[in-house]
Amino acid sequence: MSRKKNKNSLSTFVNTILTIFGENPFKPMNYKQIAKIMSVRDAAGKDVIYQILVTLFNEGKLIEDRPYRYLLHPDFIHEYGPKPQYITGTVDMKSTGKAYVIPDEEGEDIFIAANNTGKALHGDKVKVAMFPKRKSKKNEGEIIEIIERAKTEFVGIFSLSHGFAFVVPDRQTMPLSIFIPKGKYKSSKDGQKVIVHLTDWPDNAKNPFGAIVKVLGNPGENNVEMQSILAEYDYPLDFPKAVEKEAKSISEKIPSSEIMKRHDFRDVFTVTIDPHDAKDFDDALSLQYLPNGNYEVGVHIADVSHYVQPGSAIDAEAQERGTSVYLVDRTIPMLPEKLCNNVCSLRPDEEKLAFSTVFELNENADIKNVWIGKTVIKSNRRYAYEEVQDMIEGADGDNKRELMILNDLATKLRAKRMKDGCINFHSEEVKFILDENGKPLDTYIKVQKEANMLIEDFMLLANKTIAETIAKPDSKFKDYTFVFRIHDEPNPEKLYNFIQLVSKLGYTMNISSREKLVKSYNTLFDAVDGKGEKNLVETVAIRTMAKAVYSTTNIGHYGLAFSYYTHFTSPIRRYPDLMVHRLIERYLIENQPSVDKEEYEDLCLHASEMEKRAAEM
C-alpha cells in the first residue's frame, strides 16, 4: 500500500510540475523557481524536483532553454497547458509554406508556422488550436482540422523523372509540388501545362498525390495560358450540354401575346452606346419630347429574366458563374452565346423585350416622374462610344440633336451627384492590341470620356431609383428582402497611410468630416491629373476604400454617396442584376410577398466572391 501511495504521489508531483510549465509556456524555469511555486522549502523536496526536471528533459517533455532552465516541449503544451481556444477561419497560404488564418469572426489574423499547417492549403476552411499568447507577440496557433477543402484541382507544369512525376503548381499560394504516381500521367509530356486533381495525401507523405485530368499544352502559347487562368480559378470555359440544349430551344420570336402585356416603345427614338467591339448590348436609352416641355428618358435593360427561369439549367449555371469574365483576348460569358449575343442583346432594328425605368426630367435634369415596368423596344441605331464622343466634341452625325440632349441631361445629373458628395474616381485602363495569334503588338490607355459618362450617369440613376423604390422608409416594400450594392467607408489605417503618402508628394487631405474628406479626394484627383504621380495616387486611393459587395443588408454606397443602391442594368453579364429583375417583378408587378433573406444573402455572398475572382483573373 505504501509503495502504491508513494508512486501515486510521485505521479501527481510530476503532473503538477508539467502543469506549471504548461501554464507558463514561454517562461524558462529552474528547480528553485518550481519549488517556490509549489511551496517546497526543504532541501530533500527541492532535490526531488531537480531530479524530476532532469528526467523530464531526458524523456523529451522539457527542453533546455538555457543551462538548467527549462520550457515545456511544444508537443505537450495542449496536454498540460491551459485549455486551448479553438477558432475557425480561412487559410491564407504564403509561398514559403507559412500561413495566416483569417478568423470567421472579428479578430486578428492567426500566424501558422510552416510546421503547424498540417495538410491545409490556401483557401481551406480550418480549425485552429490557439497557442497561449506571449506578450507583444502575434496570435499563433496550429491547424488541427480541415473543415472544408477549398480547391482540389491545380494548374501547373508536369515534370517527369525516372519512374515518377510531379506537377509544380503555377499558383504561389500552393508551395507544394503534387506527386503523380505511375499510370496517372494521362498523355502528359515533360514540361507541359496540365490540370491535376488531388486524389490522396497519405499520413507519411510530405506532398499530396494527384492524377492528371487534362493536358492544356505548351506553356507560353496564348490559348494555353488563357485556359490556365480559367482553370486556376475554377471558371468553366464551356457550358454543360444541358445548358446549351436549353438555350438552343429558346425561340427568338416574340409572341404577340407577350407584346400585348408590355408598354410599347418600338416607335420611340432608342439607341445603344457601347464599346466598338461589344456584342452583348444589355442597355439602351430612349428619348421623347413631352407636351409640357419636359423630356422622357427611358433606361431600357435586356429582360433576361423573361428567358432565364429559376430552376432551369441556364439559371443554375449563371448563378454558379456569377459574372462574365473579361480576359485580354476574349470574353467568357455568364450566359450561353445565343442569349447574351442574340436573343437578349438589344441589337438595332430588332424587337426586343426590356425591363425599363422611365424618367420624366425637366431641362435641369430634375426628376418629375418615374415609371418602372416591362417593355418592348426597337433600337434605331447602335453607336460606339467613339462616334458619340466625336459628336460631343463638335462633329456632325446621325441623331446628334437627341444625343446632345441626353448628354446635357447626363452632365447635369453628374453635377448633382458630385454636389451630393460622390467621389470622382478617374478611370484609366490599359488595353492590348493583339495579333491573330493573341500575341500583344501594342498597348494604349483607354480613358473614360463624356460619352462613357453619359451612359454611366443614366445607369447610376436607374440603379439608385430601383433601390429607392424598394427600400426607402415610405415604401411598402421597405422590409422586403432585396439585393443591395453596398460600399463601406474607408479603412482608417489605410486612409492614414494614404494621407502620409500624398503629404510627401505635397498634397493635403482634410478628414474632419465625410464631406471634407470627399472634397479632398476630388480636389486631389483634379490636382494629379496629367502628372507623373497620377497613377500611383489613384491606385493607392482606391485601395483605401472598402470593396463594394452585394448584400441583403443595406448600409448605402459610400463612394457614390447614395443611401440606396443596387445593380439592375447588366443582367446579361451579372447574376445579381438578374436577381434584382426577378425581385422587382415579384414585388412591383405581381405584388407577391418577400423572399427568404437567408437564401438571398447566400446568393449575394457567392456573387461577391465570383466578382472578386473574376477581377483577379
What kind of feature is each model-predicted range?
Residues 2-298, 305-350, 382:
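Charge-lined substrate channels and their catalytic hotspots, especially those that engage the 3′ end
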